[in-house]
Amino acid sequence: MALRSPKSSRGLSQDPTTRRIWFGIATAHDFESHDGMTEERLYQNIFASHLGQLAIIFLWTSGNLFHVAWQGNSEARIKDPLHVRPIAHAIWDPHFGQPAVEAFARGGGLGPVNIAYPGVYQRWYTIGMRTDQDLYTGAFSLLIVSTLFLVAGWLHLEPKWAPSISWFKNAESRLNHHLSGLFGVSSLARAGHLVHVAIPESRGGHVRWGNLLSASPHPQGLGPLSAGQWGVYARDVDSSSHLFNTSQGAGTAIPTFTGGFHPQTQSPWLTDIAHHHLAIAVVFIIAGHTYRTNFGIGHSIGGALEAHIPPGGRLGRGHQGLYDTINNSLHFQLGLALASLGVVTSLVAQHMYSLPAYAFIAQDFTTQAALYTHHQYIAGFIMTGAFAHGAIFLTRDYSPERGRGNVLARVLEHKEAIISHLSWASLFLGFHTLGLYVHNDVMLAFGTPEKQILIEPVFAQWIQSAHGKASYGFDVLLSSPNDPAFNAGRSIWLPGRLDAIDNNSNSLFLTIGPGDFPVHHAIASGLHTTTLILSKGALDARGSKLMPDKKEFGYGFPCDGPGRGGTCDISAWDAFYPAVFWMLNTIGWVTLHWHWKHITLWQGNVAQLDESSTYLMGWSRDYSWLNSSQLINGYNPFGTNSLSVWAWMFSFGHLVWATGFMFLIPRRGYWQELIETLARAHERTPLANLVRWGDKPVALSIVQARLVGLAHFSVGYIFTYAAFPIPSTAGKFG
């Protein structure tokens, strides 16, 4: 008999039921579980997957460039970046009636088009791309790079070129490559591109391959560099009257320390950004060489960890044994990487609006809303993934004997204290915040709004004041005219920063008040609850006091239901899916607070948020309802507008989200009955019964059903929530 799929598992391929299909999909990338898998082959497969993923990323970015060059309006937008709406691509849809054709014909396009909200137009403009030919060249170049990575992935699976296990486990060399090579050299390349191409373009010049070596980025060339007079390069900065993309008001400085924003583009000065990338390059290139590689100089990470035993004795064996624990567990390494990447992605969301690096992106409000929403949701999924792989590490890779007495073992020994403290914090934040909101709602409902509990966030205001925001009147550190740092900031370093901080038209230091206080604590409640569920799920992944080590009891991973001792209670997967529920809710609050804060700032009516965000009816009425009018009329019996696709997504998102509960709540018996009923009906229906299948239909397991439920819940939630801030902004500002 021919071997059926999945070829990775002989046992599963011989399963006569539909379990073969679903388990085959579920374990397709679980290389560890595949037949005949060795540790070396596992590392090689993952390495090849990395190269394949990079190939897909470069192909995707190539497609962005190509479609904008082909169907976009980049050259028209460069002439008027504040008023011409950027086109992502054309829409060809046979279902479009004349009202839809007219509604979607925007941005100077010849027919229906999609408007681009990811900020790529602003990015390409900032880095010096000025023509469609530039975009085509970039698309073709990235297509070549994508092909190279695809070939590299295939090549490194061939026995002759496949790296050995020792190569993968050489942590010092990997850090050297990642820190110095990827971060350091790429930052240096970025600084070089800004200095040689982007900054000259912003000053009305034009540098391409033909004149790259002859066009000096500074009038004095390399003279000051060789003479050690580096300060020369920072003199003669662009003036406040500089018109971007022209020589009017332009200076000659390359790396600067000006601070603040370019008055016209409302983005940080390009010369400041070049200086930043140069500094990052120096730091990371040095950092990557602090570890011992082939040359016998620098630190051994293993040696440093083994020697790190705190003298007080309160941390037991300290970090002994951690090097081997981490270096031999891909799940531990992935957990650390995902935790770091998740935090960085959330920071990107925050910096996209507070320090908008690309020219004119700060004035494209819908793009700001889209980028913030996108990056916060991505960050949430990545961070929950960190906990998931931490739990898998404990389940599959952790050896209590090898790590006995070190810091990781002590964390596990203290897990009851960790979980109970997180529980206390979550309960405190949740009940007090809800109490504040409900009290304020009742006071307004009873006609006594003056009896609301309004709390000024004085600690946060003090921190903002210490950094230079003078409007609160704290007169402390950088907000005090008598402070030495204040005076130094006016002349020596970042002279434009304090002006930017005190400018209420940007988002650098948003003014905060009593409306921000409860929503901040609501978000804190959500964050702590998510962390509580994830931490408990990971820390209890192997067992609890009831069941000391689940791994030794022969149970399947992750959970065998209440009938066999209640192991679902100590299942990381069963903690993971309610944690994703909480993560999505929390980011919903984060995103909607950000959006209301900014939409009132952009419209010039910040008092609306200040007055209405202190009670729940204010949120429902003055934010949700008030900003939904154009959206809920995206399509109606009288016609359609350009928000109709978002209106449809909003409705469809609710349906997908609700479908998720159908999988999350019922148990396996319900599904088995439903499937057998459907199968029986199918086999007795004329024509339909001509289609047969070889596998006996069986219900999804609890774990699989929860995965299907979680996928629907997550996708539906994001379709519902993201389809509010983005189009409601577009309806007001385009």
Swiss-Prot record:
SUPFAM superfamilies with a match to the protein in the record: Photosystem I subunits PsaA/PsaB
EC number: 1.97.1.12
GO cellular component, one term: chloroplast thylakoid membrane
Membrane topology, record value: Multi-pass membrane protein
UniProt: phylloquinone binding residues: W671
InterPro entries in the cross-refs: PSI_PsaA/B, PSI_PsaA/B_CS, PSI_PsaA/B_sf, PSI_PsaB
GO molecular function: 4 iron, 4 sulfur cluster binding; chlorophyll binding; electron transfer activity; magnesium ion binding; oxidoreductase activity
Binding site for chlorophyll a B3: M662, Y670
TM ranges: 46-69, 135-158, 175-199, 273-291, 330-353, 369-395, 417-439, 517-535, 575-596, 643-665, 707-727
Cytoplasm is among the record's keywords: no
Principal location: plastid
Binding site for chlorophyll a B1: H654
Complex and partners: The PsaA/B heterodimer binds the P700 chlorophyll special pair and subsequent electron acceptors. PSI consists of a core antenna complex that captures photons, and an electron transfer chain that converts photonic excitation into a charge separation. The eukaryotic PSI reaction center is composed of at least 11 subunits.
Alphabetized PANTHER family for the sequence: OUTER MEMBRANE PROTEIN, OMPA-RELATED, PHOTOSYSTEM I P700 CHLOROPHYLL A APOPROTEIN A1-RELATED
Protein family according to the UniProt entry: Belongs to the PsaA/PsaB family.
Protein name: Photosystem I P700 chlorophyll a apoprotein A2
Organism annotation: Selaginella uncinata
